[in-house]
């Protein structure tokens, strides 16, 4: 009996742990995912009744607005996002770039230049159960893969969605903080609008000024603030239903929607621009999926978010149906007097939490754009030791702050900001609907009827709301359009210039026949050390190498062509990150190393990179020797042959490592350097503490009698070169359009791309290359 109970308890333990983790993630999601969505009741009714709908302020119109809010909130956030879209995650990640990444992997739609077949062998590349032989609409796949213009249009649609999400990062803090602060005017009736705007700006500046500290120190407060806020507004809504108008439940009938449009006509259609604000923030359910699970996000929405917000909208409608004149400040007027100030404080905190979540999402979007080659290089700071992916981008932070304060000061009106906010949110939602339809066809391999039904059902609703928002372009709706145009231009010009640069490198790479004709010395003096040549090419030798050796006919004894590239997956496992291969015969001592990162990976300043590189090359040499022993000699060229080097490889590292931090070893490692270079390095290390604190190691060959002498010689040459020192060689490229190019190309390359390249961070900075070891080779490209 006890044994059976023990077995049963053991079986139940994983289930208990699973549900405990699910509840914990659902609780934490309130502070990250739902902050923006939960603050919508602050301004929905005010924005809806701000225009021509003022002429229809009566109980029946309020019932019609509530019916629209209820069915819109049920159809889009609940049915579309919670039920369907959350299932389209990219290995746990969400957002427009996650959908685009899925499409690029399951159909050849990507513009990433240096992709190779080895990338498709990544464990997270394809969706489980996917097979290209059973795809639906093969003609559509072939059409999009064949026609560059179709793929360009798809990219522009994704960039439009990303630009609008960046616009959300500007508009959400402005409307949320200003709405919460406007509650002061309910009790302090003599307070001027300028004072409310000033207080809002102070809060906004403080919010952005604290971004560099990260959110981990106060993140534990986010979830309880939002939960308290939700229970507050849910309880207030229930109180208002009972106290003011218990018949308000009748408004849930679609009959009142029909009656609403019969009464208001075109004015009611224009008022939809205010009603759509009830679902702003639901895109965050999908975009911020990475830190949670779809099950936890669904659980939080269904059990708490949906009922609390519906109760609040119903309660506010019940209050307004009996207090029509209080429409401009309906939310705060509906709060019972004794709890006004506590609710005001919680509302302000909830607005800050909602703004924080959107700002963090904006940083993530910019990082993804950069990883996919669609945004200039910016500084990315990892702000959390425990939460992977929590980042801070200083340049973007200050741009957002300036634009957010400018919008707040310029408009000073929640309605005008709401008009702009609605355009941005509905555009992002429609982009998601469009991409989801393609996901159903290319990734889920569903029937065309299923995908078309999804697109027509949700797309038609979103188009109606979007058209209503666009009617208010002159009343603030122009702001997100202008912002999106600016950000899209920056993204596409950078993408265009980067692609042209890669195409030039690809067309002008050095042939292997020429390299082999030079012999093992490469027709230059080979000096001790390792030369790391950065290139975007994954095959061949870049022309920067011949350009360098032509002007300075000397190079290092060991050459490594290093390519750091992005692949269209969110994360690359460390065990799959490194691809190592050989260029030319063994005597040439030339290797290729490809380091792969996902679009959500953060490239940290890893002081162990050089050591990892040497270890991986050593592993490759041993693997190649094992393969060659069972086949032909590998003294011949092996160009194009790459191997994935993993930390858990069956081949143990042939190199022994020991710390070399003592003075004697340090001097031994530097013995081959000139006195002036050693002095310069010492000065540099004193000025750069991070460099001086880097771990120094010394490699040694183990005493193995059975090791092949050629392999031992090659490993010994690699170790001695590492101890001599590593030099980084990188091209400093100037790109100019050809004289016969079109006006667009000349403007994009000579003006736009040139300006962005000069004002963004240099590649050596983003790759954390020490300046003391860097050689930049000037190159001029005519594209």
UniProtKB/Swiss-Prot annotation:
It comes from the Eukaryota. InterPro entries: K+_transporter, K_trans_C, K_trans_N. It is a multi-pass membrane protein. Residues 662-691 are annotated as: Disordered. Residues 677-691 have a biased composition (Polar residues). The chain crosses the membrane at residues 22-42, 62-82, 153-173, 190-210, 218-238, 269-289, 299-319, 339-359, 391-411, 423-443, 448-468, 476-496. Residues 43-61, 174-189, 239-268, 320-338, 412-422, 469-475 are extracellular. GO terms for cellular component: membrane; plasma membrane. Keywords: Cell membrane, Ion transport, Membrane, Potassium, Potassium transport, Sodium, Sodium transport, Transmembrane, Transmembrane helix, Transport. It catalyses: K(+)(in) = K(+)(out); Na(+)(in) = Na(+)(out). It is found in: Cell membrane. Residues 1-21, 83-152, 211-217, 290-298, 360-390, 444-447, 497-783 are cytoplasmic. GO terms for molecular function: potassium ion transmembrane transporter activity; sodium ion transmembrane transporter activity. Its main location: membrane. One of its GO terms (biological process) is potassium ion transport. High-affinity potassium transporter. Can transport sodium under high sodium and low potassium concentrations in the extracellular environment. Belongs to the HAK/KUP transporter (TC 2.A.72.3) family. This is Probable potassium transporter 2.
